[in-house]
From Swiss-Prot:
It comes from Shewanella sp. (strain ANA-3). Signal peptide: none annotated. Belongs to the RNase D family. Its EC number is 3.1.13.5. The gene is rnd. Residues 230-310 form the HRDC domain. This is Ribonuclease D. Keywords: Cytoplasm, Exonuclease, Hydrolase, Nuclease, tRNA processing.
C-alpha cells in the first residue's frame, strides 16, 4: 500500500483551503496506475528524478517526483521495476512537462523509459530567456521568484537505500512543489517577450537524439587527446574505444572504470604485441592489465591498418582561427546585448566552433545551431556579413 504524508505548504496563498497539498509515496502498481490515470488528464506535470551515479555507465534511478497541482507523488522505482504506465506520460502531447536543468533527467528517461518528455518546459532555460541570468540553480531561482529558501542538504545522499528518510522525502517533494509555483511567473514573462516558442524549441533541441544507441564506430573521437595520434595509431584507438564502450555497456560501468582515456591513448601509441610488452606500460593500472590484458591484445589485432581513420580535425589549430573566432564572438556578443540574451545561449564556444566549421566546410551539411530556429532569426543576417 502507498504511504500518505501531509506537506503543509500552500501553492497559492489566496486559495489556502483549496490547495492544501498531499504528497503520496507510490510503491505499488495499483497506486501507480491510479496516479497515471489522473496525470493523463492534467495540462501541466512537474517532473524530477533522484539518482546515484558513481561507477556505473547509467544512473541508478532512486526516486521520481511528479506533481500536477493536485497530487504530489514520490514514486519508488526500486519497489516498482515496471514503470511503463508512468513512462507513457512523457510523450503525451497534451501535457506540458515542467523540469529544471534536466539534461541528466533526460538521460534517465531515455534509459529507463525509452521515451523523452514533450512538450518540455525547462525553468532554467526559461529564466535565461527572460533575462534573469544564465544557469540559475533551482534554489536560487526559487529564492529570487518566491522568496523561499530551500535546504539542499539531501542532494548528495544515497537515493537507493531504503527506507528513505523523512528529510529525503521532504527534500524531494520540495523540488517539484516550488517548481509548480514558478511556472506561471516564467510563462508570463516569456509570453510578454514573445519568447515562449523559443523555450519549447529549446526543449525539442534538448531531447533530440537522446534515444539513439551509442555509436560504437565513432567512440574513438570522444577519447581525450585523440587529435594527437597519427592515422596508424587511430586505427588502434578506434577498435580499443569500441571495445571499451561495448564492455562498459555490458557491465554497466563508467568508461573510466574499464580503462581511462590516457590508457587507450598509450596503447594506441605504443602498440604492445605481447603480454610482456603490455605489462611494461605505466599508463595502465595493474588491475586494468590483469583484468583486460588478454582482451586488449586480441582487440588490437583486429585494427584495420590498411584503412585507418582520417586524422582528427582540430579547428583551433587551423590558420586564421583566432581572428575568425574573435570576429564571430564580437558579433554574437553585440547581438546578445541587443536582445538581452545570455552569451551562453547564443555565442558559446560550442556555437562558434560549430558555425565556423560549417563556414569553412563551404556551408555543407545541416545548419549549425546558431543559424537554426530563433537563433537564426537573430544572428543569420549579421553572421553572413562577416569575412571569416
Amino acid at each position: 500500500m502507498s504511504r500518505l504524508l501531509f506537506l503543509w505548504t500552500v501553492l497559492n496563498p489566496q486559495e489556502l483551503e483549496k490547495n492544501l497539498s498531499v504528497f503520496q509515496y507510490v510503491s505499488d502498481e495499483a497506486s501507480l496506475n491510479a496516479l497515471v490515470a489522473q496525470y493523463q488528464q492534467s495540462p501541466l506535470l512537474v517532473l524530477d528524478t533522484e539518482f546515484v551515479r558513481t561507477r556505473t555507465y547509467y544512473a541508478k534511478l532512486g526516486l521520481i517526483q511528479a506533481y500536477d497541482g493536485k497530487t504530489l507523488a514520490l514514486i519508488d522505482p526500486v519497489a516498482l521495476p515496471d514503470l511503463s504506465a508512468f513512462w507513457s506520460l512523457l510523450d503525451n502531447p497534451n501535457i506540458i512537462k515542467l523540469v529544471h536543468s534536466c539534461s541528466e533527467d533526460l538521460e534517465v528517461f531515455a534509459h529507463y523509459g525509452q521515451r523523452q518528455p514533450t512538450p518540455l518546459f525547462d525553468s532554467q532555460i526559461a529564466a535565461s530567456l527572460c533575462g534573469m541570468g544564465h544557469g540559475l540553480g533551482y534554489a536560487k531561482l526559487v529564492e529570487t521568484c518566491l522568496g523561499e529558501v530551500i535546504d539542499k542538504g539531501e542532494s548528495r545522499t544515497d537515493w537507493m537505500r531504503r527506507p528513505l528518510t523523512e528529510a529525503q522525502l521532504s527534500y524531494a517533494a520540495n523540488d517539484v512543489l516550488y517548481l509548480y509555483q514558478l511556472y506561471p511567473q516564467l510563462a508570463d514573462k516569456l509570453k510578454a517577450q514573445d519568447r515562449l516558442g523559443w523555450l519549447y524549441e529549446e526543449g525539442e533541441r534538448m531531447t533530440e537524439g537522446r534515444l539513439a544507441t551509442p555509436d560504437m564506430d565513432t567512440a574513438y573521437l570522444r577519447v581525450k587527446n585523440a587529435f594527437q595520434l597519427t592515422e596508424h595509431q587511430l586505427a588502434y584507438l578506434k577498435v580499443l574505444a569500441k571495445w571499451r564502450l561495448e564492455k562498459a555497456l555490458a557491465r554497466d560501468l563508467a568508461l573510466g572504470f574499464v580503462i581511462k582515456d590516457h590508457g587507450l591513448i598509450a596503447l594506441a601509441k605504443k602498440q604492445p604485441k605481447s603480454m610482456g610488452d603490455l605489462l611494461k606500460l605505466n599508463d595502465l593500472t595493474e588491475q586494468e592489465k590483469r583484468i583486460h590484458g588478454k582482451d586488449i591484445l586480441r582487440v588490437m589485432q583486429t585494427a584495420d591498418l590498411s584503412n585507418p581513420p582520417e586524422l582528427v580535425d582540430v579547428l583551433a589549430l587551423k590558420p586564421g582561427y583566432k581572428s575568425a573566432f574573435k570576429n564571430i564572438k564580437t558579433c554574437l556578443s553585440e547581438l546578445c546585448e541587443q536582445h538581452a540574451i545570455p552569451m551562453e545561449m547564443l555565442g558559446s564556444k560550442r556555437h562558434i566552433h560549430e558555425y565556423l566549421q560549417w563556414r569553412w566546410d563551404k556551408q555543407q551539411g545541416e545548419l549549425p545551431t546558431v543559424l537554426s530556429g530563433w537563433r537564426g532569426q537573430i544572428a543569420a543576417e549579421s553572421l553572413a556579413k562577416l569575412d571569416v
